[in-house]
Amino acid sequence: MDAGVGLRAKPGAWAGLGNPRRSSTARVPVRFAVEKFAQPLVLGSDRRSCGAKLKVSCSRKPAGIDKTYYSADEALVLKQKAEDVVPYLNDRCIYLVGMMGSGKTTVGKILAEVLGYSFFDSDKLVEKAVGISSVAEIFQLHSEAFFRDNESEVLRDLSSMHRLVVATGGGAVIRPINWSYMKKGSTIWLDVPLDALARRIAAVGTASRPLLHQESGDPYAKAYAKLTALFEQRMDSYANADARVSLEHIAVKQGHSNVTTLTPSAIAIEALLKMESFLTEKAMIRN
């Protein structure tokens, strides 16, 4: 990335971050789905293979990241912090965990961009693997358990690869087997206040959120209630991550009154800082 390009940040951009049919017994190989879906994000002039098992292409196609997420200063800091972190990563994958709507996909794409990694969204890979166009439809046609089984298959196959940033589904942390896969790389928890998540989800709708779409009533109230219940179930699991990125902490550091004015690049910078701290401490212990 050219850190010298004048790029303007979008206040509050984090709040808009994004996030086909088969039988329950016949399984489409996950490796095939990943290979077909691969859209690598690669920067730099001397990148090594992304790994062989899933055959992810490392072609230098444009990353397609909306550069308006960066200011020139943020772009420079991202570049510098990525250079600091890369030697400690040793090509290991990075897995982003956190509640639905926490910005894992957009922050993950930024991290992949500056690290020269490829990016994957595990939910999208499950959709490709089972041939169903959305997680909500998978839940409707099959079950949550069916989705979780395929999610574990995706994470298992990704764990054999290198140089990937993976945005996981909000519930991926509940299965211990998934942690055994993710711990082959490094894990980052994006910790977003539930109130901010509920407001964001209520604004965009719950149709794509199968765990939130059943109840009727005020969108914010039902989103907040369900998110609170889910977080209580998952909190200890999220805490297993190697690094925690607290958006409240970033907001305080930057003098924001709330997290909705943070840019995705500011969150990505904090993720790199936390990852560098964890990896350097780990290296010191080993030595």
UniProtKB/Swiss-Prot annotation:
Residues binding ATP, per UniProt: 98-105, 209
User: Out of the domains of life, which is the source?
Assistant: Eukaryota
Instruction: Write out the catalysed reaction.
Output: shikimate + ATP = 3-phosphoshikimate + ADP + H(+)
Tissue range of expression? Expressed in panicles.
The protein's name in its UniProt record? Shikimate kinase 3, chloroplastic
The UniProt record lists the keyword Cell membrane: no
**GO biological process entries:** amino acid biosynthetic process; aromatic amino acid family biosynthetic process; chorismate biosynthetic process; shikimate metabolic process
Family assignment from sequence similarity: Belongs to the shikimate kinase family.
Q: Which organism is it from?
A: Oryza sativa subsp. japonica (Rice)
Could you tell me the EC number(s) of this protein? 2.7.1.71
Q: Which GO terms describe its cellular component?
A: chloroplast; plastid
Signal sequence extent: none
Disulphide bond pairs: none
What GO MF annotations does this protein's record show? ATP binding; metal ion binding; shikimate kinase activity
Which portion of the chain is the transit peptide? Answer: 1-57
Taxonomy of origin reads: Eukaryota, Viridiplantae, Streptophyta, Embryophyta, Tracheophyta
Names of required cofactors: Mg(2+)
UniProt keywords, alphabetically: Amino-acid biosynthesis, Aromatic amino acid biosynthesis, ATP-binding, Chloroplast, Kinase, Magnesium, Metal-binding, Nucleotide-binding, Plastid, Transferase, Transit peptide
Where is it mainly found?
A: plastid
Q: Sorted alphabetically, which CDD domains does this protein's record hold?
A: SK
Q: Name one Pfam family in it.
A: SKI
Q: Where in the cell is it found?
A: Plastid, Chloroplast
Gene name of the record: SK3
Q: In which pathway does it act?
A: Metabolic intermediate biosynthesis; chorismate biosynthesis; chorismate from D-erythrose 4-phosphate and phosphoenolpyruvate: step 5/7
Where does the chain bind substrate? Answer: 123, 148, 170
The UniProt entry, under InterPro entries, shows:
P-loop_NTPase (IPR027417), Shikimate/glucono_kinase (IPR031322), Shikimate_kinase/TSH1 (IPR000623), Shikimate_kinase_CS (IPR023000)
